[in-house]
Swiss-Prot record:
Native source organism of the sequence: Arabidopsis thaliana
Gene: NIT1
Keyword Iron: no
EC number: 3.5.5.1
Name assigned to this protein: Nitrilase 1
SUPFAM superfamilies hit by this protein: Carbon-nitrogen hydrolase
Taxonomic path: Eukaryota, Viridiplantae, Streptophyta, Embryophyta, Tracheophyta
């Protein structure tokens, strides 16, 4: 994963006649549905939206949680306590096949799409490492560089049966010419210590890809924008029954009684909110499409005049957070030569 040292630093605004240059950035959220069990078609769909967003001047394009590979809303995978189900195993095999390696050919293609369209791209994806899946966010630069990734630290509810947990080694905030860019996935946004870690890294463009289309979610996004003094971009899929595989067990029947082709399964709600708590675009609960806003990075300083949660409004003498950024590995192999060298250094 590239470190922020490889990135261009934020350009300092030099005042001219007492007025700072423009700090306006156009940002776009893509609210759309995965093409389930067809990753190439999903990336084709993503590219069309990226081209459209770029043609309208977007400099940053954000996609929802698990867009590539698919958020498995209502999928059963044969899960029940103490029960092993062959049909569930087969479904997981299909889901695993739709996930992508990072890095890998799909990542290379996305990097090229970002380059061709001159945008920063933040993409939700299901990543596979061996036979463990992770809910991941991928970051790309307009130069076609894969910057790195964030793996979801804590899958929610039954997500824990199919996704592994990320660790502290993948919680980046990238210092870019359009602002400091990072992400928290879905209900990670309810983890105050994780949010604090992102604030401490100086996040300015807070991307929140999610599967939560509830109206209550909007309150969380508004709070985070004010608490963090940052722009919040929350991207959620808009999905209808027709977007899912044609099999009744793909959806929990007690959740979705309406099996009509056009019935809404995930209602979106993508939204862009300023550090001052102003809703700049969205929420869109109606359809697939783009949610776009022109943001003024100067609003960050305006907001932090009164409240900076990790700066002048913090009390490190009373409350202090330690973040472990070391990769967490289940197995570490040590050769005899390495062990001998380690022993000689003691």
């Amino acid at each position: 994963m590239s470190s922020t040292k490889d990135m261009s630093t934020v350009q300092n605004a030099t005042p001219f006649n007492g007025v700072a240059p423009s700090t306006t950035v156009r940002v776009t959220i893509v609210q759309s549905s995965t093409v389930y069990n067809d990753t190439p078609a999903t990336i084709d769909k993503a590219e069309k939206y990226i081209v459209e967003a770029a043609s309208k001047g977007a400099e940053l394009v954000l996609f929802p949680e698990g867009f590539i590979g698919g958020y498995p809303r209502g999928f059963r995978f044969g899960l029940a306590v103490g029960v092993h189900n062959e049909e569930g195993r087969d479904e997981f095999r299909k889901y695993h096949a739709s996930a992508i390696h990072v890095p890998g050919p799909e990542v290379a293609r996305l990097a090229d799409v970002a380059r061709k369209n001159h945008v920063y791209l933040v993409m939700g994806a299901i990543e596979k490492e061996g036979y463990t899946l992770y809910c991941t966010v991928l970051f790309f630069s307009p130069q076609g560089q894969f910057l790195g990734k964030h793996r979801k630290l804590m899958p929610t509810s039954l997500e824990r049966c199919i996704w592994g947990q990320g660790d502290g080694s993948t919680i980046p905030v990238y210092d870019t010419p359009i602002g400091k860019l990072g992400a928290a996935i879905c209900w990670e946004n309810r983890m105050p210590l994780y949010r604090t870690a992102l604030y401490a890294k100086g996040i300015e463009l807070y991307c929140a890809p999610t599967a939560d289309g509830s109206k209550e979610w909007q309150s969380s996004m508004l709070h985070i924008a004010i608490e963090g003094g940052c722009f919040v971009l929350s991207a959620c899929q808009f999905c209808q029954r027709k977007h899912f595989p044609d099999h009744p067990d793909y959806l929990f029947t007690d959740w979705y009684d309406d099996k009509e082709h056009d019935s809404i399964v995930s209602q979106g709600g993508s939204v862009i909110i300023s550090p001052l708590g102003q809703v700049l675009a969205g929420p869109n609960f109606e359809s697939e499409g783009l949610v776009t806003a022109d943001i003024d990075l100067g609003d960050i300083a305006r907001a932090k005049l009164y409240f900076d949660s990790v700066g002048h409004y913090s009390r490190p003498d009373v409350l202090h957070l330690t973040v472990n950024e070391h990769p967490r590995k289940s197995v570490t192999f040590v050769t005899k030569v390495e062990k001998a060298e380690d022993d000689s250094n003691k």
